[in-house]
Swiss-Prot record:
The keyword tRNA processing does not apply. Keywords: Ribonucleoprotein, Ribosomal protein. Involved in the binding of tRNA to the ribosomes. GO terms for cellular component: ribonucleoprotein complex; ribosome. The gene is rpsJ. It comes from Helicobacter hepaticus (strain ATCC 51449 / 3B1). One of its GO terms (molecular function) is structural constituent of ribosome. This is Small ribosomal subunit protein uS10.
């Protein structure tokens, strides 16, 4: 039995929350203990570009990208838990990072 940490990232928080819910449901079906999901601070990236390619430096446009993060800890992962996580079909825009941590 080992501890697994899942770190999920997405631009859309609704898609991220649906993916987190499906992961939590799959882990609970196998009987493993779970901690989370823990929402981490949203990172905001702002970009400012000139509207005109030639003149009018005062005329600018601002864009923002928000990256939402969640962490899920699976405290006692069994082989069934790992199999159920591998079979999950998550949204393609959700980035999942898996870290294995021994006790």
């Amino acid at each position: 039995m080992e501890r697994i940490r899942l770190r999920l990232k997405a631009y859309d928080h609704r898609v991220l929350d649906r993916s987190v819910a499906s992961i939590v449901e799959a882990v609970k079906r196998t009987g493993s203990e779970i901690r989370g999901p823990v929402p981490l601070p949203t990172k905001k990236k702002r970009y400012t570009v000139l509207r005109s390619p030639h003149i009018n430096k005062d005329s600018r446009e601002q864009f923002e990208i928000r990256v939402h993060h969640r962490i899920i800890d699976i405290m006692s992962a069994t082989p069934d838990t790992v199999d159920s996580l591998m079979k999950l079909d998550l949204a393609p825009e959700v980035d999942v990072e898996v870290m294995s941590m021994s006790k």
